[in-house]
């Protein structure tokens, strides 16, 4: 649902942010 989709997107963004550090 919406919650799982948002969590997936946030997870991807977090991985990208961590990779950029």
UniProtKB/Swiss-Prot annotation:
The keyword Secreted applies. One of its GO terms (cellular component) is extracellular region. One of its GO terms (biological process) is defense response. Coiled coil: none annotated. Expressed by the skin glands. Keywords: Amidation, Amphibian defense peptide, Antimicrobial, Secreted. The keyword Acetylation does not apply. It is found in: Secreted. The modification Leucine amide is found at residue 21. Belongs to the gastrin/cholecystokinin family. Magainin subfamily. Antimicrobial peptide. This is Peptide PGLa-R5. It comes from Xenopus ruwenzoriensis.
């Amino acid at each position: 649902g919406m919650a799982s989709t948002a969590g997936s997107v946030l997870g991807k963004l977090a991985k990208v942010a961590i990779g950029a550090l």
